[in-house]
Amino acid sequence: MTIHVKNNIHWVGQRDWEVRDFHGTEYKTHKGTSYNSYLIREGKNVLIDTVDHKFSREFVQNLAAEIDLASIDVIVINHAEEDHAGALTELMARIPGTPIYCTHNAIDSITGHHHHPEWNFHPVKTGDSLDIGNGKQLVFIETPMLHWPDSMMTYMTEDAVLFSNDAFGQHYCDEHLFNDEVDQTELMEQCQRYYANILTPFSPLVTAKIKEVLGFNLPVSMVATSHGIVWRDDPTQIILKYLEWADHYQEDRITLFYDSMSNNTRMMADAIAQGIHEVDPGVAVKIYNVARHDKNEILTQVFRSKGVLVGSSTMNNVMMPKVAGMLEEITGLRFRNKRASAFGSYGWTGGAVDRIQTRLMDAGFDISISLKAKWRPDGSALALCREHGRQLARQWALHPLEAPCPIITTSAAAAPVVEAGVVVEMSVPASAGVVEVGVPAFSGAMELPVSRGVAPTTCEQDDDQPMLCTVCQWIYDPALGEPDQLVAPGTPWARVPDSFLCPGCGIGKEVFEPCAVEACV
C-alpha cells in the first residue's frame, strides 16, 4: 500500500494497529503507531528509512510491488533504531550494493544491529547534500541525541519537505496520513505525550537544533515524520509547540501520584487535593495511583504540571516499589521548572517520605515541605492534610490568590492529647528553607500530635448539624439518620455508633467533620 505525499514522494511505510508496548514496555502505545518510510522518484530513486523489523518481509514485498528494487539508487537512514531501519537486512539481501547514506554514528549502530559491516555506507554530516536530479537535492542535518547519537533529518529542496525522523512525531495510528485529516485534540495529546516521555531529557538540544534549522532560512511546506501523521497543514505549528515545550514548560496544574497498601496514603492524597482546590479553584489537579494508572499518562501530566506531590506508604522502611520506579523514570526525564513535595502514611517507621524527598531533590525539583501521617489518618489528620494542600496552593500559585483565612487552630506548643496514636509529621530538607504549614515555622522535622476528637474549625458542633465525609463528600443528615445501619432519623452525630461506616466509601466516623452550611445545601 502506498499513499501519495507530494509530487514524486510516496509513503511506503507500515501501520501497526495492534502494538501496545514500545521500547520494551516503557511506552504504552494505546493508539498504535506507524513506521513511516518514503519513496522519492526523481532523477534518482531514493528510499528514506524502512520499518520495524517485525514487518521486514511484508515491507520488502510491498516495496517490490511499487518499484523494481534494483532501480533504487540510494537508501537514506535517518535513525538506526530497529523501528526505523529494522527491514534493512531483508532489503539489502535483495539489493546488496545499494549505497546507504547516514551519519557516522549510525554506521556503528546499524552494523551493531544487522552485523553487515560490508554494506556500502556513505557517512554524511550537517550541510552535506545529495543531488537527486530534476534540480532537487537532499540536504542532511545531524540531530545527535534527538534522541540517539546517530539521529539526523533530511531536507528535500524545491518540494520543501523536511523528513524529521523522531522529532515532531507521535505514536498514533490512523487510517489517514495527514494532520488536517485527524482529530486535532487527540493528535496534540499524542504529540505532547510523545515529547514528554521521549524527548524531554533533550529539551536544550531541541531548542538549539530547531533554531539552527530555522537559521538556514529554508521554506518548509511539509514535515514528514517517522511515526504518526505527516504535517502538511501549517507544519510550523508543531515546530513552535516544540519550542514551547522545550522552554521549561509548565501549566497551572498539579499532579499527585501515590501507591498505598491500606488506602491511608490515598486518603491523604484526596484531602491534600481538596485543600488545594479550596484555595485555588482554578488550578487543575489530577490524582493517580501508580499501581493502576498508565505510567506514561502520569509522566505526561508531570511534564505539564507546575507542581508534583508524590505519596507512598512505608514498606520495609522504604517507599513502595512502583513509586520508586516512577521516580527513577522522572529522574531520567530531567523535568525542569517544577515544585515537588512528598507525603505518605506509616506505622512504626516512616522512611518512605524522606527517601521520596531526597529523590525529588536529586531529580532537580524545587522541594517544598513534606507530610507524614502515622497509621490511618483520622478527621483531624485529614484536616491537616487539607491545610497542607492550602499552603502548597499558595506557595505554588502562578497568579495572586485571595488572602488565606485561618483554618487550623492547633499549635505545636499546645497540642491536644493523642487519643489514638495518630501523628502527623511535617518535614522539610534544610535546602528548602523555612515553610509555614498552618503551624509555627520550622526547618528540619517535627511531629504534631492530633486528637481524633478535635474538629478542625472554630465553630461549635450542634446536635442537628450535618456531617461531611472528607473522603467521598457523602453527608450525614441527623434528620434522616441512616436506616441501613440502624441509625434512626433524629440521631445526632455524637450518638451515632462508632461502628458506623460511610455509605459512600466505607470508611469510619473518623473521616467526618462538621459540614459548613453552604456545603450542605
Swiss-Prot record:
Keyword Ligase: no
Gene3D superfamilies for the chain: 2.20.28.10, 3.40.50.360, Ribonuclease Z/Hydroxyacylglutathione hydrolase-like (3.60.15.10)
Cofactor: Fe cation; FMN
Pathway connected to this protein: Nitrogen metabolism; nitric oxide reduction
SUPFAM superfamilies: Flavoproteins, Metallo-hydrolase/oxidoreductase, Rubredoxin-like
Keyword terms: Cytoplasm, Electron transport, Flavoprotein, FMN, Iron, Metal-binding, Oxidoreductase, Transport
Disulfide bonding pattern of the chain: none
Cofactor: how and how many bound: Binds 3 Fe cations per monomer. Binds 1 FMN per monomer.
Subunit structure, interactors included: Homotetramer.
Listed name of the protein: Anaerobic nitric oxide reductase flavorubredoxin
